[in-house]
Structures are given as structure tokens and as C-alpha cells.
Regions:
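Short N-terminal segments immediately surrounding and downstream of signal-peptide cleavage
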Residues: 21-36, 41
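A composition-driven surface/loop motif
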Residues: 79-811
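Glycine-centered tight beta-turn/hairpin loop motif at sheet-sheet or coil-to-beta transitions
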Residues: 29-31, 58-61, 723
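Hydrophobic h-region of N-terminal signal peptides that target proteins for export
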Residues: 10-18
Length: 811
């Protein structure tokens, strides 16, 4: 009984301690039964059965019920507020208790029930605001800077903003405990927390909790007309009719936590700049045309964590009207809705430093990154996943310039036909797309277009593409398709790893490019293509390109040996204009199994090879093809086709230097084929094998040539008359060809030329022997080679072209 009486007396005493703002603590056997700020208590009453103390707030609602028998002792926490150095406002239902030590120093406070108005001319006044009211507000008019601590404040206004800093002063808001601000839906002000001047948010480090919860029923959750700076604390916008946080100037977010789960419009909307240097921000906007973050000025992020999600149509995760820069921190953006974008800028986007960015988009016609001007990246790690049809990973109107960092992109949407000027035009799902040029000098690229992406492009420029560095792993697996443009006009669309409508320059970098869909291209340009640099190091540029998809029938033909139809053929490397190879290591394969059309290297104009280490293998068509002229001036070159020509040109051909082996299939296919056009040989070592060969044009050739008629699979050795070995070569076993053409069979023509061949000299040609030892490269032997058995013939070279019978039947 005495314990109960003692506790009751202490509880009654506690009700007079509001000015000290202590916490009341009930103990039981060394444990805390209950703790609450005294300012939260509106009353305490007692139950007789069981004998208990009931704690109510100022509105009469029960906070807790504690059995008297369980209480060992009662103490007060040391959160003491010296009443002489700050203004203390304690809201209590429809009333408020005010302690104003500066009444004679220019601070006037008026009270109308729970609505408090402050007028201050004093500089640096500290305010401490606490308590609870469902029908109260605080308006501050000050022409000088002030500091306000919110401590376990729950304030709901019945008519206006919960807190309104009505004049343009600098406000430091210190968060202590758990605070909630709610405005009235009919308020004429812009937000539950309205700040006319600058706002800085910090936390009270003596308290373990520093939360501000805001409900904006009239318009915004928080509105700041000046600069808003957040250094610490947790801000939760529980709901808002419009923007979660709205600002007319800048936002400087240096630390603390922000949560905006469902604003009525945008999450953050600032007319100035936004700088994020730390903290954690989680923003989700779900209405149509919403922006998770909207900024009229510069957006810059150096550190911290930013998580943004939007789900409405025509929405933006981050929308910047000016330059957007991310050079640190972690950014995650999730996008849904028709035509929505992850990160969008009207000017320039720059990814730098240690930035970690992940964007996932399911938006139809959406973009993970969208710039109406340029996009640059020189560092960071970016992962983009977009699955909507005709969507883009990176889309720019201006130049894409990438010099470093890591990009991983999965583009699983597909192509759609759009109507433009009464014609069907394909719109693609593309990983990186520029309406102008793409310039890449470094970085790591992992790009995948799965089978769901029909006809998509990995890296695509409407203008020129220039790549001078970087490590590229690109795979396209979706099939292309034929479509009707209008009336009876047909066309097709196919996937590409690298695609430019203008010119393309590949001077350095490592490329592993794979295209498996029908009609797929590895590298495709509508203009000229330049590979490598003059006299460059072959190790500086590594090109591994493979296609395996079959051709697409666009229009059917009328039969005949070539069919006569129109096809979209798979190509590993294709240039609509001139193609020049200066250096680099190229390994190019077309492994189609059903139809021809899969050429490894093709130019629809001229092909010039000045250098490089080139190997091209085609299973069903020419390994290398040019339309008007093919010239080899240098480099090491190997071309092989199982079913067609090794090296083919529909116009003229010139072999002026380099080392070449070119293998075609059985008759009528050839190692070197330029039909009946000029075939010029002036230098280099060249071996061409196949069922036949184009005949060199003797009037323009300056280096002697041997045309050796032999058999498929024969070993050939060519020696000077003194026994010096010029060439040891194992002819390939021919495949393909034949059919309805005359000949077929195992007959093979080997065209050979070398600077060691001289007119007026005799040479020994051995054939059908056995080669042992040495080092072999595609049938060509060097080093310590022994040749045994077989037959031989002596050849007198008295003309530019000398025909040799080495067990063959001629062509």
C-alpha cells in the first residue's frame, strides 16, 4: 500500500514537470516497464481492478496501462531542458504551454487555443517544440536565423500548415525523437511544413531517434522556397496531394534518410539544383507522368544510396532539365508504365568515378537512360535491364562518348512496326542508341539480346561510330523478319552487334561478338568501315566475330542456280561502303548450315587490306567478298569456305603484298574469284586453292605465278633448282561445290605466287608426298620440314603465268 501511495505521489508530481521536459520511467526488477516524455501525458488515472495506472495523451487516448504491483520504482530521464535559454512550446490538445525567456528581447508569441504565432526580431533564437495536438499549428515570423528542435511532436492542423516559417529567414530544424506533422486539406499554404527561407535539417545526437513524418493533405509534404540542406535525421513523407518535397531553389542532401512511398505527384521537385553527397533516399511515385526526382537545374550525386521507382505511364525515375552527373554512390531505378524513362536529361548525362547504377525497366518504348543531348561515361558500373518492346538501354539525341567504366545491358524487348508517311518502319529494342555519333575509347561492355529481341541492335548510331578502345562481349540471339513496307514493297530487319548508318572506325579494343538469329550481323555499317591503324600493332585490336543464323527470305525467286530471290543474309562484318583493314587480329566465322549468304567479311564497294592478322571461315558462302574491287597490300590473311569461294570480288582484284591463303570449295568455286575482271598480282606470297581459279591478267601482273593443277588433299612442295624450299603446303580436302557444274570431283587448282619466283628460272614442284615436322598454319609449313615420297616435275618459268600439272586435270 505504501508503494502504491508513493508511486501515485510521484506520478502526480510528474505532471508538473513539463517545463523541464523530462521522461518518466517505470521500473520492475531492473527492467524498464514503460517510458514516455512527460509532455506527452494529458492525464493519469487508476483502475481499481486490477489496480493499474492508465496513461492518457492530451486527447484522452490511452497510451499504456501498467499494473501498480509490477512497479518497483519510478525515475525521470535526464532529457532536461534549461528553460532560460530557449523558447519552449508544448502542445497539449487544443491548448499549448509557452515558455518565452526572450519576451523583452524582441520575441512575441501569440496563442489562439492550439494555434501559435511567433514574431521575432532577435537573431539566433532557439525553439523547442514538443507535445501533441490534433488541432494546432505553429507560424513563425522572424527576420533573423533561428534553430528549432522538434522533440516527440505530433501536430495536426485544423486549418493550415502544421508548421509555417512565414518569412525568409534561415531555419535550422533539429530532429529529436519521433515527430509527425499533418496539415489540413483546405489549407491555403503549400505544405504541411512550409519554409519561406532556407532550411537545414540536423539531428539531436543525444537522442537515439530523429524522425520527422509528414502528411501533406493540401499540396506538398514539405515546401521550401530557399535552399534545403539535409545533414542528418530521417524524413518520411507519409503521403502528399502533390509533391513529396518541393523546393524553389537547391537541395543539398549530405546525410540522413528520406522515404517517399506514394506522393500524389513527384517525389522530389526542385527548381534549382540537387546535390546528393550521402545518406539514403527511397522514393516511389506511382501516378501517371510522375517523376521520382524532378530538377530544373543540375543533378549531381557523389555518394549515398538512391532508390527510385515509378510505375505510371510517361513517368521518369529522375528527370533533369540540365546536366545530370553521377560520380559516386549507389543508384537503383525501377521503371514501369508506357513510355517511361529511368534517368532522363534535357542536356547532358555523365557517369563517372565509382558510381554504381542499376536500372530495371519493363516499360514499352521506355529508356533506361535518355538524353536529349549527349551521354558520357568514364567510370562507374552500370547495369541496365529493359524488357519492353522498342525500349532502349541508353538513348541520346546527341553523341554517346564512353571512355571507361563497366556497362552490362540486357535488352529483351522486341521490334515493332510503326507507320511513318503511310509506310511501315521498324522500331527496334536497342541497348545503346544515338541519333548522331557514338565514340568509345575505353570501358567494359557486356551486352545480351536474348531470343525475345527480334531484330534488335546492341550498339547503334544513326551517324558515325568510332571505337578506339574497350572490351566488348556482345551476343544477339533474336531472329530477324521480313515485312511489308507498303503495297508490294518488301524489306527486312535483322539484329546487329555493332551498327552505324554512317561510317565506322574500329582502331583498338577487344571484341567478342556473336549473332545467332536469322539474318543477324556482327558488325554492320551503312557507310565506310576502317579496321585498325596504318602500321598498327595487331594486338591492339582483337576482333572475334561469329554468326550462325540462317538467311531470311524477303521475296521468292524464280528458281535457277542462284534462286533469284531477295534475302536478308547473315554477315559477320559488312560495309555498305569501302572497307579498309590496316591492322588487328581478326577471327571471323559464319557457321550457317542450310543456306548460302553467310559471308565473313563483305564490302558492297571496295575492300582494301593493308595489314592485320586475318582468319575468315564460312560454312556456306564466300569467306571474303567485295563488289567493285578487292586489294591486298599486306598483312597475314586466311580465308576458307566449305561451299563457295575463299576470296571473291564481283569487280577487279589486286594482290600487291602480304601473305595470303585462300581456300574455296570444289568446282565451280575458287580460292581467288573475280570472274573475268582484271586480276592483278604484283607482290606478296599468295596461295589460292579450289575447284578453279580466276586467271591473272598478265598485262598488269609483275610477279610470276604458278597455276598448279593437282588433287584435293595433296601435299605440294615448291623448290628452287638448287633445292631451296620456297613453299611446303598441304592442299585442303575440298567440300561443297560440284552439283550440276562440270568437273566437281577431287580436282583442285592451286594458284601460287611468291617474290622468290623469277622469270627465266627453273623450279621443282613435288606433289602427293608426305610432310613431316615443321610448324603448320592452315596447311602451310615452316621450320624443320621433311617431305618424302610422291612425284615431282620440273617447271621452267618463262611467262607471268605458268601452268603446272601436278596430278590434276586442269580448269
Amino acid at each position: 500500500m505504501r508503494r502504491a501511495a508513493f508511486i501515485v505521489a510521484c506520478l502526480m508530481l510528474s505532471l508538473g514537470l513539463h517545463a523541464q521536459e523530462k521522461t518518466i520511467i517505470l521500473h520492475s526488477q531492473g527492467n524498464v516497464l514503460y517510458e514516455t516524455p512527460v509532455s506527452n501525458l494529458g492525464g493519469i488515472y487508476f483502475l481499481s481492478s486490477p489496480i493499474s495506472a492508465v496513461f492518457n495523451n492530451h486527447d484522452g487516448a490511452t497510451l499504456n496501462t501498467v499494473p501498480i504491483s509490477a512497479i518497483d520504482s519510478l525515475t525521470f530521464g535526464n532529457y532536461d531542458i534549461p528553460s532560460g535559454d530557449r523558447v519552449i512550446i508544448t502542445f497539449n490538445g487544443n491548448d499549448a504551454e509557452i515558455i518565452n525567456p526572450f519576451a523583452n528581447e524582441g520575441v512575441i508569441i501569440e496563442k489562439s487555443q492550439g494555434d501559435i504565432t511567433v514574431y521575432s526580431t532577435k537573431f539566433g533564437v532557439p525553439y523547442f517544440v514538443t507535445g501533441s495536438s490534433t488541432n494546432g499549428s505553429l507560424t513563425v515570423n522572424s527576420n533573423s536565423a533561428l534553430t528549432m528542435t522538434l522533440h516527440d511532436l505530433s501536430l495536426t492542423s485544423g486549418s493550415t500548415a502544421a508548421i509555417n516559417f512565414a518569412t525568409a529567414c534561415d531555419v535550422e530544424l533539429i530532429l529529436s525523437g519521433d515527430n509527425t506533422l499533418t496539415d489540413n486539406a483546405n489549407s491555403a499554404l503549400k505544405a504541411a511544413l512550409q519554409v519561406t527561407g532556407n532550411l537545414t535539417v540536423n539531428e539531436d545526437t543525444s537522442n537515439n531517434e530523429h524522425v520527422l513524418r509528414v502528411q501533406g493533405n493540401a499540396k506538398h509534404g514539405i515546401n521550401v522556397d530557399g535552399v534545403m540542406t539535409v545533414n542528418a535525421g530521417t524524413i518520411q513523407i507519409m503521403g502528399s496531394d502533390s509533391d513529396g518535397v518541393h523546393g524553389s531553389s537547391d537541395l543539398l542532401w549530405n546525410g540522413g534518410t528520406l522515404s517517399i512511398p506514394a506522393p500524389g505527384s513527384d517525389g522530389l521537385d526542385f527548381s534549382g539544383n540537387i546535390h546528393i553527397a550521402g545518406g539514403n533516399l527511397d522514393i516511389h511515385a506511382n501516378t501517371e507522368s510522375a517523376r521520382g526526382i524532378k530538377v530544373s537545374g543540375i543533378f549531381e550525386m557523389a555518394d549515398g544510396t538512391l532508390n527510385v521507382g515509378v510505375t505510371g505511364n510517361d513517368s521518369k525515375g529522375i528527370k533533369c532539365d540540365s546536366t545530370l552527373i553521377v560520380h559516386g554512390g549507389v543508384v537503383e531505378v525501377n521503371v514501369a508504365g508506357e513510355g517511361s524513362n529511368g534517368i532522363s536529361s534535357d542536356q547532358h548525362i555523365s557517369i563517372e568515378g565509382t558510381a554504381e547504377i542499376t536500372i530495371v525497366s519493363t516499360s514499352h518504348d521506355g529508356k533506361c537512360f535518355k538524353s536529349d543531348n549527349t551521354f558520357a561515361m568514364n567510370g562507374g558500373n552500370v547495369t541496365l535491364t529493359h524488357s519492353g518492346d522498342v525500349s532502349k538501354g541508353i538513348k541520346t539525341v546527341g553523341v554517346v562518348d564512353i571512355s571507361g567504366g563497366s556497362l552490362t545491358i540486357t535488352s529483351s524487348g522486341s521490334t515493332e512496326l510503326e507507320t511513318v508517311n503511310n509506310q511501315n518502319v521498324p522500331a527496334y529494342c536497342t541497348a545503346i542508341k544515338s541519333d548522331t555519333d557514338i565514340v568509345i575509347s575505353g570501358g567494359t561492355f557486356h551486352i545480351t539480346l536474348p531470343t525475345t529481341n527480334h531484330g534488335g541492335k546492341s550498339i547503334s548510331a544513326d551517324g558515325n561510330m568510332t571505337i578506339s578502345g574497350g572490351d566488348f562481349t556482345i551476343e544477339t540471339h533474336g531472329n530477324g523478319a521480313a515485312y511489308t513496307v507498303s503495297g508490294s514493297t518488301k524489306d527486312s530487319y535483322t539484329s546487329s552487334c555493332l551498327k552505324s548508318d554512317g561510317n565506322m572506325v574500329l582502331s583498338a579494343g577487344t571484341f567478342n561478338l556473336t549473332s545467332t538469329g536469322t539474318g543477324g550481323k556482327g558488325i554492320n555499317t551503312g557507310g565506310t568501315m576502317t579496321i585498325g591503324t596504318p602500321n598498327g600493332n595487331n594486338d591492339d585490336l582483337i576482333l572475334n566475330v561469329t554468326t550462325s543464323g540462317e538467311r531470311i527470305t524477303v521475296t521468292s525467286g524464280g528458281g535457277g542456280p542462284w534462286g533469284g530471290g531477295d534475302y536478308a543474309n547473315p554477315k559477320a562484318i559488312k560495309a555498305q561502303g569501302n572497307l579498309t583493314i590496316n591492322s588487328g587480329t581478326l577471327r571471323v566465322n559464319c557457321t550457317q548450315t542450310q543456306n548460302e549468304g553467310g559471308e565473313c567479311i563483305e564490302s558492297k564497294a571496295t575492300l582494301t587490306i593493308n595489314g592485320g592478322d586475318i582468319e575468315a571461315y564460312s560454312k556456306k558462302d564466300d569467306a571474303v567478298n567485295a563488289r567493285t574491287n578487292l586489294t591486298i597490300n599486306g598483312g597475314v590473311y586466311y580465308a576458307h569456305s566449305d561451299a563457295n569461294d575463299g576470296t571473291d570480288c564481283n569487280g577487279t582484284m589486286a594482290l600487291n603484298g602480304g601473305f595470303c591463303i585462300s581456300n574455296g570449295a570444289r568446282q565451280p568455286e575458287e580460292g581467288f574469284d573475280c570472274d573475268n575482271n582484271q586480276f592483278k598480282i604484283t607482290g606478296g606470297t599468295h596461295i589460292g586453292t579450289g575447284g578453279g581459279t580466276s586467271n591473272p591478267t598478265t598485262s598488269v601482273c609483275t610477279q610470276p605465278i604458278l597455276k598448279i593443277n593437282t588433287q584435293s588433299g595433296y601435299a605440294i612442295q615448291i623448290l628452287k633448282s638448287d633445292g631451296t624450299v620456297i613453299c611446303t603446303y598441304k592442299c585442303p580436302t575440298l567440300s561443297g561445290g560440284g552439283g550440276g557444274w562440270p568437273g566437281g570431283g577431287s580436282g583442285l587448282v592451286m594458284l601460287f605466287t611468291d617474290p622468290q619466283l623469277q622469270t627465266g628460272q627453273s623450279y621443282i614442284v613435288k606433289y602427293n608426298g608426305t610432310i613431316n615436322g615443321g610448324t603448320e598454319w592452315h596447311g602451310y609449313y615452316t621450320g624443320n620440314v621433311t617431305y618424302s615420297g610422291g612425284s615431282q616435275t620440273t617447271v621452267n618459268v618463262n611467262a607471268i603465268v605458268t601452268t603446272v600439272n601436278a596430278g590434276g586435270s586442269g580448269w
